Structure formats: C-alpha cells, structure tokens
C-alpha cells in the first residue's frame, strides 16, 4: 500500500514483514526545504525485494519508485540511497543464488560509486554488472527499461 500524508506532503511507502511495520520511506512533494526522501526505521538493514521472487536478475537501485518500475521485468532491491556497506554485501551474498545476475543501476551522477560497488559484489562471488543511463530508472519508459535489461 502507498499512502499520502496531507500534513507532511509526502507519499509514504510502508515496508512490512508479514503484519509488522518495519519502516517507511517517504517522498516529499511540498514547496518547502524538506529533504526529498525521508525514512523511518532501519532502512540499511532491510532487504525489501520487489517483483518476481526468482532472483535470476536482481537490480539494485536508489529508491523504491525506481524499484517498483523495474519490478515489471526483474527482482528489484531499493537501497534507500546510494551506499551499499560491506555488511550488506555479505548478507546479500547469502540470500541470492551465486548464478544470479546482480545489476547496479544508480542515478547517472553515481557512476563511479556504481563501479566501486560492483567490485565489492564481485569480491563476494556475485555476478555484478552496471547499467549507466542518462536518467534515473524511474524516469525511463518501460520500453527503455526493457532494452537496458535485455542486453
């Protein structure tokens, strides 16, 4: 479920495990100087996979809106930012199958960070790749996303 908070002017994405609320991530749409994205909960500890649970192809992206859009084609994992800690890579390497393709698709200004993250993923035995595009994943059409992912 996606919610709207009129008082906070945020689109709210709650994250549940069964019936328990683990965290939420909100996107600000107001005119003020609030942070664009804001969350509550242990966002860096959550693996909120969206899409097909097959895990053949997993795309790591910055935000939940991109993950929702990417999930039309693969399993997507929002990072709730751009950082992937070594501990998070370790945990991810125990969750997914070693033959899974792990694609890092961050915003265009994060290309060098994507390269570093891909190298760490490879150190943990994962088949990591990078997608570099001129737009955030959420800003692409579904046709464009399919072209990037089918290559």
Which stretches of residues belong to each language-model region?
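Phosphate-handling DNA/RNA-contact segment within nucleic-acid enzymes
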Residues: 3-98
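TOPRIM fold recognition
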Residues: 55-58, 64-151
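Short, surface-exposed acidic
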Residues: 1-2, 129
């Amino acid at each position: 479920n996606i919610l709207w908070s009129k008082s906070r002017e945020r689109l709210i994405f709650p994250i549940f495990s069964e019936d328990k609320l683990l965290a939420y991530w909100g996107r600000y749409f107001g005119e003020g100087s609030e942070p664009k994205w804001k969350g509550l909960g242990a966002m860096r500890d959550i693996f909120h996979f969206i899409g097909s649970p097959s895990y053949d192809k997993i795309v790591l992206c910055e935000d939940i809106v991109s993950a929702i859009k990417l999930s039309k084609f693969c399993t997507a994992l929002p990072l709730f930012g751009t950082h992937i800690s070594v501990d998070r890579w370790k945990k991810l390497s125990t969750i997914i199958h070693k033959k899974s393709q792990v694609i890092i698709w961050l915003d265009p200004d994060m290309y060098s960070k994507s390269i570093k993250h891909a190298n760490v993923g490879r150190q943990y035995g994962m088949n990591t790749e990078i997608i570099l595009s001129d737009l955030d994943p959420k800003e692409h059409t579904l046709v464009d996303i399919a072209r990037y992912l089918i290559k």
